[in-house]
Design a protein with these regions (language model features):
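Cationic, low-complexity basic patches in intrinsically disordered or flexible, solvent-exposed regions
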Residues: 8-9
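Short, hydrophobic beta-strand segments
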Residues: 30-36, 82, 98-101, 152-164, ...
């Protein structure tokens, strides 16, 4: 092997290691899905309400802020949408949705909770509202999508607030990340105690385990 070829291979290996590191640190979508033993039209919004009641709403933007009704499939246009100013209580939002109950409908609600968010590169953080989406699927919606995605599913958005892998892990960063994770864990624990869900799953779009990613993140500086 010539020196030039060896140098090219070394550069290529370095390039792919860099790519792998970037891919590994990419933010991932985070979800919490629940399945129930009974989830017909008469029960599904009641089950969703039991989850919403445990949610730690943002102090500055409390309540349900948005509701949309999707018929049959995500490809179909919504047949009803409403924004709430100020935010509605879970009971009020569910009451709006309860007028149209069908097994092939999906009911989407949005709310916000407060998570620690970096404001500057100098280490300033603030509690800022972050959107969480509640998705309630009828059993026949999107050809039975609820079987794999959840009858009630929470979309937390990207897992960035619970890892912040883009930041150097100082004591300050670690304390804020841990506070956000504790908010998530406390909410899930309350749901597990109060709901009658038969199956519950916290999962990510990539299939990676959030707890393992967090442990790995913390261990890199120990």
């Amino acid at each position: 092997m010539s020196k030039n070829t060896a140098r090219q291979l070394t550069l290529a290996a370095s390039f792919f290691r860099g790519c792998a590191s970037k891919i590994q640190n990419m933010a991932d979508s985070l979800y919490f899905s629940l399945w129930f033993s009974d989830f017909g039209p008469a029960e599904m919004l009641v089950r969703a309400l039991s989850v919403m009641r445990q949610f730690p709403f943002s102090k500055g933007l409390p309540g349900i802020t948005y509701y949309a009704l999707h018929p049959v499939s995500w490809n179909e246009p919504t047949i009803f949408e409403q924004r709430f100013h100020p935010g509605a209580t879970p009971e009020e939002a569910i009451a709006v949705a309860a007028d149209l109950l069908h097994e092939d409908y999906a009911y989407v609600f949005e709310a916000k909770w407060d998570l620690w968010t970096p404001q500057t590169s100098e280490g300033a953080w603030t509690l800022a509202p972050s959107t969480v989406t509640f998705i309630v699927r009828g059993e026949e919606f999107e050809e039975g999508e609820s079987k794999t995605q959840g009858e009630v599913q929470l979309d937390f958005g990207l897992d960035t607030p619970f890892l912040h892998e883009e930041l150097k892990l100082t004591q300050g960063v670690e304390s804020r990340v841990r506070a956000n994770v504790q908010m998530l864990v406390d909410f899930i624990n309350r749901v597990e105690k109060s709901s009658i869900a038969g199956t519950r799953l916290l999962w990510s779009e990539s299939g990676e385990n959030l707890a393992q990613k967090l442990v790995g993140r913390l261990q890199r500086v120990q």
